[in-house]
Amino acid sequence: MKKAIHFQSQPVVFNCASCNSNFTIDSTAKQKDLAIDICGKCHPFYIGQLTKQTVHGRAEKLSQKFNAGKAFLENKTKKSNQAKVEKQTRHRSINEL
């Protein structure tokens, strides 16, 4: 075996940011303390609390965006048409003329 090419293993403390648990593992990391976002004690997959999400494809997402845009434009034109009709049908008094 060649010398000075092998990784140096040392005990490293991993700190979970979600559940504040600490555990020590032999690792080749150079830091003595490492912060991780989530661990096996608090990850939903490992504790059995998975939430089912509906996954849509790209085409379905795009069509939903277009449908939402069409609905917005239809509501906008209806409101502007109603405002025009109200403006035309409003009777003016002599003082307003």
UniProtKB/Swiss-Prot annotation:
* Keywords of this entry: Ribonucleoprotein, Ribosomal protein, RNA-binding, rRNA-binding
According to its UniProt entry, the function of this protein is described as: Binds the 23S rRNA.
Q: Where is the composition biased (Basic and acidic residues)?
A: 84-97
Task: Give one GO term, molecular function aspect.
Answer: rRNA binding
Give the source species: Mycoplasma genitalium (strain ATCC 33530 / DSM 19775 / NCTC 10195 / G37) (Mycoplasmoides genitalium)
Entry keyword Ribosomal protein: yes
Gene name of the record: rpmE
Q: Which GO terms describe its cellular component?
A: ribonucleoprotein complex; ribosome
The UniProt similarity line reads:
Belongs to the bacterial ribosomal protein bL31 family. Type A subfamily.
Top-rank taxon of the source lineage equals Bacteria
Carries keyword Kinase? no
Describe the subunit structure: Part of the 50S ribosomal subunit.
Q: Which GO terms describe its biological process?
A: translation
Residue numbers spanned by region Disordered: 75-97
Q: What is this protein called?
A: Large ribosomal subunit protein bL31
